[in-house]
């Protein structure tokens, strides 16, 4: 389930209604976005909510122009999510670049994740990391239960 950044009623409602296997927090590398990611991670880790954080994904990690596919421009900062993952002892599941082909492919019904490109590879690596993280969570932890609210 894709949720808005931070912590809000929608996050609480979700964990009250659905036994969530785990949370994957997505952020861009700049400080203001990382602050929201920290709040989200902290919320899921509270004793009352107790939803395992499976990992962190850095979106828009760098910009790569189509005409210079090997160039990386860190327009939102560099390695913000990697540093946060290390600090909070969670897995960095992947880094997704900001490239025009993502938008174009989506608009044309051609997902870049299926292409043999740097971006396609990033999405494939992310998918493998997510599967491994879920497998690890399921081996090491009991199933998550819905959050019970007492009145």
Question: What is each of the regions a protein language model found here?
Answer:
Residues 1:
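ATP-dependent carboxylate-amine ligase catalytic core
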Residues 4-104:
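Conserved catalytic-core segment of NTP-binding enzymes
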Residues 40, 110-111, 149-150:
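Alpha-helix boundary/capping detector
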Residues 51, 74-100, 116-151:
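C-terminal accessory "lid"/substrate-recognition subdomains
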Residues 106-119:
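C-terminal boundary of histidine-terminating zinc-finger modules
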């Amino acid at each position: 389930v894709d949720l808005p950044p931070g912590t809000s009623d929608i996050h609480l409602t979700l964990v009250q209604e659905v036994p969530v296997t785990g949370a994957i927090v997505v952020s861009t590398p700049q400080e203001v976005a990382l602050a929201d990611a920290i709040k989200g991670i902290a919320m899921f880790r509270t004793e009352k909510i107790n939803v395992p954080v499976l990992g962190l994904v850095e979106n828009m990690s760098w910009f790569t122009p189509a005409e210079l596919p090997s160039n990386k421009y860190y327009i939102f900062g560099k390695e913000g999510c990697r540093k946060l993952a290390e600090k909070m002892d969670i897995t960095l599941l992947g880094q997704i670049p900001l490239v025009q082909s993502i938008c174009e492919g989506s608009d044309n019904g051609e997902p870049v994740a299926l292409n043999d490109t740097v971006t396609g590879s990033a999405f494939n690596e992310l998918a493998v990391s997510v599967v491994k993280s879920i497998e690890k969570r399921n081996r090491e932890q009991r199933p998550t239960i819905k959050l019970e609210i007492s009145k």
